[in-house]
Amino acid sequence: MIVRTTDEITGTNRDVAAEHWRSKRIILADDGVGFSFHETTIDANSVSEFHYQHHVEAVWVVEGTGTLTNHETGEVHPLRPGTMYLLNGHERHRVTCDTTMRMLCVFNPPVTGREIHDENGAYPAAVQAS
């Protein structure tokens, strides 16, 4: 059994921040359960581009409002608490936040925690944990 709190993750290598977002990576590949689980917060009035070419991501919005743009189809979806989106086709997408948004995210395959978004907003296929 694994039990963790976000308080004990804060300020560690599981607490990853970029210009407009912060991700507390609660479960990672080295936990050996086949997925990773993150709490991600994205700043109000920000736009973030992502493209997970090697991962499927499920996202559950728990706080805040914004929009999700699917760059493959041009569709725009409202985001608010209770909204889930699944990137099962590795879609290039944009998250535009009207207010600060907090989301719970599951990745498969699991991330190691060492990944860095590249210029396309993607993670590499595999990164060795250290």
From Swiss-Prot:
Protein name in the entry: L-ectoine synthase
Q: Which GO terms describe its biological process?
A: ectoine biosynthetic process
- What NCBIfam families does its record include? PRK13290.1
Q: Which UniProt keywords apply?
A: Lyase
Lineage top rank: taxon: Bacteria
Q: Which PANTHER family match?
A: L-ECTOINE SYNTHASE, PTHR39289
Q: List the Pfam families hit by this protein, alphabetically.
A: Ectoine_synth (PF06339)
TM ranges: none
Listed as disulfide-bonded, the cysteine pairs are none
Q: What is its EC number?
A: 4.2.1.108
So what does this one do? Catalyzes the circularization of gamma-N-acetyl-alpha,gamma-diaminobutyric acid (ADABA) to ectoine (1,4,5,6-tetrahydro-2-methyl-4-pyrimidine carboxylic acid), which is an excellent osmoprotectant.
Which pathway does this chain act in? Amine and polyamine biosynthesis; ectoine biosynthesis; L-ectoine from L-aspartate 4-semialdehyde: step 3/3
Q: Which Gene3D superfamilies match?
A: Jelly Rolls
Please list the GO terms describing molecular function: ectoine synthase activity
Q: Which reaction does it catalyse?
A: (2S)-4-acetamido-2-aminobutanoate = L-ectoine + H2O
Q: Which family does the UniProt entry place this protein in?
A: Belongs to the ectoine synthase family.
